[in-house]
Amino acid sequence: FVYGNGVTSILVQAQFLVNGQRRFFYTPDK
């Protein structure tokens, strides 16, 4: 998606990736 200018878009997408990785790695196995 596009959010603000190119740099802002990259930062937002990177933040979503980091949040997704945290959720993936720190979700306990059930």
Swiss-Prot record:
Functional pH dependence: Stable from pH 3.0-9.0, inactivated at pH 10.0.
Main location: secreted
Domain of life: Bacteria
Entry's Gene Ontology BP terms: defense response to bacterium; killing of cells of another organism
Location(s), subcellular: Secreted
Disulfide bonds: none
Record's keyword terms, sorted: Antibiotic, Antimicrobial, Bacteriocin, Secreted
Keyword presence, Secreted: yes
Activity over temperature: Thermostable, activity is retained after incubation at 100 degrees Celsius for 15 minutes.
A GO term from the CC aspect: extracellular region
Other facts noted in the record for this chain: Antimicrobial activity is lost upon treatment with beta-chymotrypsin, proteinase K and papain, but not when treated with lysozyme or lipase.
Function summary: Bacteriocin with antibacterial activity against C.jejuni.
Name of this chain's protein: Bacteriocin SRCAM 37
Taxon lineage: Bacteria, Bacillati, Bacillota, Bacilli, Bacillales
